[in-house]
A protein has these predicted regions:
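Non-catalytic signal-transmission and effector/linker regions of two-component phosphorelay proteins
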Residues: 1-28, 43, 127-128, 132-136
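Acidic catalytic/metal-coordinating carboxylates
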Residues: 43, 69-72
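Acidic, metal-coordinating helix/loop segments flanking the phosphotransfer/catalytic sites
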Residues: 40-58
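C-terminal output helix
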Residues: 94-96, 110, 114-124
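Active-site residues of response regulator receiver
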Residues: 61-63, 90
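His-Asp phosphorelay/catalytic-motif detector in bacterial-type signaling
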Residues: 11, 55-57, 79-85
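Short amphipathic alpha-helix used as the core "switch/output" element in two-component signaling
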Residues: 71-82, 100
Length: 136
C-alpha cells in the first residue's frame, strides 16, 4: 500500500496538475504566498514519473488533462492504494463528471473559474487534517 504520511516538521506540499501554464503557475504563486510548498506538473504522466515517494498533503488536478485524464489519474491512485486527497478543477460543463469522480474517491471539486479563497479554504482544510485522516 502506498503511503502518504506527512512528516510533522515538513511544510505542507501540494501537487498541482494542470496543462495550462498560466493556471498552473497562478495556483503555485497563490499557494506559495500562503506558506504552502508546491510541485507543479503539466500532465498526469509527468506527475506519476516525478512523484514517486513524495509526501503530498493533497493534489489539485484539472479534470481535463492531455493523455491520462484527471479521472483516470484518480482511479490509478486509488487502485494502487494511494488515498492522497484529490481536489478536481472542473469547468461548468464538467460538473457531472466531477460529481462522478467524487463517488470514485475524489475529496472535492472546485468549479472553474475558481476564486482564490475557495482554493485556499479547501487546501487549508486538507493540510490541517489529523495525520490518521491524511495518511494512505
Amino acid at each position: 500500500m502506498a503511503e502518504n504520511k506527512i512528516p510533522p516538521d515538513a511544510p505542507p506540499l501540494v501537487g498541482v496538475i494542470d496543462p495550462d501554464p498560466v493556471a498552473r503557475n497562478g495556483l503555485r504563486a497563490l499557494l506559495h504566498r500562503n506558506g504552502v510548498d508546491v510541485s507543479t506538473f503539466d500532465s498526469a504522466e509527468s506527475y506519476l514519473l516525478a512523484a514517486n515517494g513524495r509526501h503530498l498533503a493533497c493534489l489539485i488536478v484539472d479534470l481535463l488533462l492531455p493523455g491520462m485524464s484527471g479521472l483516470e489519474l484518480l482511479r490509478r491512485l486509488r487502485s494502487s492504494g494511494n488515498d492522497v486527497p484529490v481536489v478536481l478543477l472542473a469547468d461548468e460543463s464538467d460538473v457531472s463528471t466531477a460529481v462522478a469522480a467524487m463517488r470514485e474517491g475524489a475529496t472535492d471539486f472546485i468549479e472553474k473559474p475558481y476564486h482564490d479563497v475557495a482554493v485556499l479554504k479547501q487546501v487549508e482544510k486538507l493540510i490541517r487534517r489529523p495525520p490518521a485522516a491524511a495518511s494512505a
